[in-house]
Amino acid sequence: MAVPNTFAGATTAIPLSQLDSNFNTPITIGNTAVQLGNTITTLNVMTLNAPTVTNYVESVVPIGTVTSSYTLNLSTGTVLTATLTASTACAFTMPAAVAGKSFVLLLKQAPVTGGGSATFTGVKWPSAGTPTITTTAGRMDILTFVSDGTNWYGSYTQGYTP
């Protein structure tokens, strides 16, 4: 059976649960060809107005152990995990400020030694001030950052046991 590949006149949603797993006929949304069914499709440079997203999971990017400096990179995800080197201060360099961009950094202490510290260049913190990173071995602080296009604004919660 031929499957139509134009939905320009559609007035209601098409429930994905009713699509056959072999429904891989490309359709065009804007300038992007999309295939439905058991495929993964990446939509680039597309504006969606008032979408509803369900069952959304962000990619977690394991940075690993950081030493005296590290430049944060958001190209592969916006939930980052890093472990501080024992008794070492790490200076984190922020990515370029893009309006509406945000990310979370799960910052852990080394499991046995702890004692690492961190600073973040160019971040505006709330009235409580710049965080003093939890130094207890094995503990974790969660730092959240959001940008207005000019600045990065940071907030934090501390002392978690992962």
Which stretches of residues belong to each language-model region?
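Detector for repetitive beta-architecture
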Residues: A33, I40, V45-A50, V79
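Glycine-rich, flexible loop/turn motifs
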Residues: V3, A10, S68-Y70, G129
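Extracellular "spike/adhesin" assembly and maturation modules
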Residues: M1-L36, T41-T42, T161
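Exposed extracellular interaction/assembly regions and N-terminal maturation sites
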Residues: L48-F120, K124, R139-D141, V146-P162
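Short, ordered beta-strand-loop transition motifs
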Residues: A8-G9, T135-A137
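Beta-strand-rich interaction surfaces with strong enrichment in secreted/lumenal proteins
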Residues: F92-T93, T130-T134
